[in-house]
């Protein structure tokens, strides 16, 4: 857990418990920009303290979860279109090179195992995605598309949790959403058709994120014990399918 949350009336204070990636500054910068350019899409930032903590307004809605309905996907597409319509001026870039390096390192470690997880790690490393670190379509990258970070009020969706935000690539961000473990119950095809990412780049970006997730939930990963038995094996099969094209 990177933070704790305290709610008092119409305000919320987020107290960071770790900030090695400069999370407080990233979140503050993103919220300041977005609250000016896209009012009511994100919380309005109020204060940033050195402890560090960030106080912001509370947004209406309930976190998304499970399988998204067509209405929810439409609203999510609207929210993402609004988010990505804002020029990412002044935001620090997403550190995609660090993600790639971390994924390679984690998958290399998984090669020491056996079974489908080791096979997927070997296969990914033998078919590594091309360089995705050059930003072709710059956007405000949310950075953490866990479904719980999208608040649904029955009509529209608002977005929270920008501690990993920055300047990023639109196609890579779409792949990040589709490959997030929290979204596995949803058929993302309608939203992907609407957002229309560059096909080849999208496929390779999905491979990157799928490999990253395997390093998180595979043996020895930081989230290895947070999911039901068989989750890592299922993820390994997903990696193999994506790499195969």
Residue ranges and their predicted role:
Residues 35-38, 83-91, 132, 181, ...:
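A general structural signal marking secondary-structure boundaries and capping sites
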Residues 171-198, 207-226, 234-238:
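Active-site activation/catalytic loop segments of kinase-like enzymes and analogous catalytic loops
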Residues 2-95:
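ATP-binding pocket architecture of kinase catalytic cores
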Residues 16, 59, 146, 163, ...:
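Anionic group-transfer/hydrolysis microenvironments
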Residues 51-69, 85-88, 104-110, 211-227:
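A glycine-centered beta->alpha junction motif in the catalytic cores
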Residues 3-7, 127-172:
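Active-site acidic catalytic loop and adjacent metal/ATP-binding pocket
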Residues 86-143, 232-242:
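An alpha-helical support segment within catalytic cores of ATP-dependent transferases
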Residues 29, 72-73, 158, 175-178, ...:
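Glycine-rich, phosphate-binding/catalytic loops in enzymes
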């Amino acid at each position: 857990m990177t933070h704790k949350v305290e709610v008092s009336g119409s305000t919320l204070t987020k107290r960071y418990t770790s900030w090695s990636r400069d999370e407080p500054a990233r979140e503050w910068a993103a919220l300041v920009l977005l609250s000016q350019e896209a009012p009511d899409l994100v919380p309005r930032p109020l204060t940033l303290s050195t402890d560090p903590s960030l106080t912001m307004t509370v947004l209406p809605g309930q976190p998304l979860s499970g399988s998204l309905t067509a209405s929810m996907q439409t609203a999510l597409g609207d929210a993402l279109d609004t988010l990505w319509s804002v020029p990412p001026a002044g935001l620090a870039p997403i550190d995609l090179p660090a993600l790639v390096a971390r994924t390679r390192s984690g998958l290399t470690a998984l090669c020491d195992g056996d079974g489908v997880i080791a096979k997927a790690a070997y296969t990914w490393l033998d078919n590594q995605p091309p360089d995705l670190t050059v930003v072709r379509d710059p956007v405000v990258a949310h950075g953490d598309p866990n479904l719980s970070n999208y608040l649904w009020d029955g009509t529209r969706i608002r977005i929270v949790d920008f501690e990993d935000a920055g300047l990023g690539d639109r196609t890579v961000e779409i792949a990040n959403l589709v490959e997030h473990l929290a979204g596995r119950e949803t058929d993302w095809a309608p939203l992907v058709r609407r957002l229309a990412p560059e096909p080849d780049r999208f496929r390779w970006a999905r491979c990157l994120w799928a490999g990253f997730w395997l390093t998180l939930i595979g043996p020895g990963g930081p989230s290895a014990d947070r999911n039901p038995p068989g989750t890592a094996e299922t993820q390994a099969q997903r990696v193999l399918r994506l790499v195969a094209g």
